[in-house]
Amino acid sequence: MQCEQFKSAKLILERLRKCPSVEILFDHEVLDLAQTADAVSVEVRGPSGIASHAGAFLIGADGGRSTVRRRSGIAFEGFTWPERFIVLTTPYDFEAERGYCYRSYFADPGTWCNCFKVSADGPPGLWRTVYPTDPTQSEDEIMSDAGVQARIQSFFPSPAPYEIVHRNLYVTHQRVAATFRNGRVLLAGDAAHVNNPIGGMGLNGGIQDAVNLSDKLIRVLLDAAPDRLLDLYDLQRRTVANEFVQEQSIANKKRLEASDPQTRARNLDDLRRTAADPERARQFLLRTSMIASQRRAEGVTLAEGYVRSCGRKRESS
């Protein structure tokens, strides 16, 4: 099921507007933050000028370029892929015209493509195709009408040009914040971890962050639980960001872009064996649906974090 981010955001906004304790401020930019032992404040710039807001905790969910993360001095560890990804959206019906399912992955020795249907404002909906680009090409070349048509036609030849209703080019990273907690500042979503989009794990991982963190914040704020519980949020969600989201999304990309014939044959054989074995198929689905990562997070304890910390100290001594 595809539920675009703008739709989930709209649903959340509608729900928040019904909460008397929530104030929603659009067109505001975070400039700086400061925290004491008892509170944290954030300085923002909005339509009426600069203002300050204070509270018990601050959640930085302000995206991959998070100001909250940077102002908190938290490193964003990982790497950036050399190639950019381009998304081309078209009303062309790949199911009716070519028999494609709603989510398809194409692994060609020369390149790869994702093709999936989104409902948009439909029916009938739209189809999005995603491709890697040549790092040596300029943005103008890639995004030109000629460049866009050449790319989509190379995968899906058609006698007529495709109608392209949206095109987007973006840089892709694999990064995880060094910590999801710094005192009264917490990170969630893309501010805490980013990855390539193959498999749809970024937004879904952020939703899992929100569920985990909100549960713990409620217990700290309303049930007088020790705020050490928030250290567990950091440990649980950072563990799965590294062990599941990063590992799986990188593996997804490498599987699609493999060009060596023997590697490609092994990959396909492995997928066939998985599809033919009910237990392997079940484990594959648990992992790709991120159910397994949620269960892994629930099993992580602060004691495990202490053992890891001690292990790092021993290694460095």
Task: Give the residues covered by each predicted segment.
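Core Rossmann-like FAD-binding/catalytic domain of the broad FAD-dependent monooxygenase superfamily
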Residues: 1-317
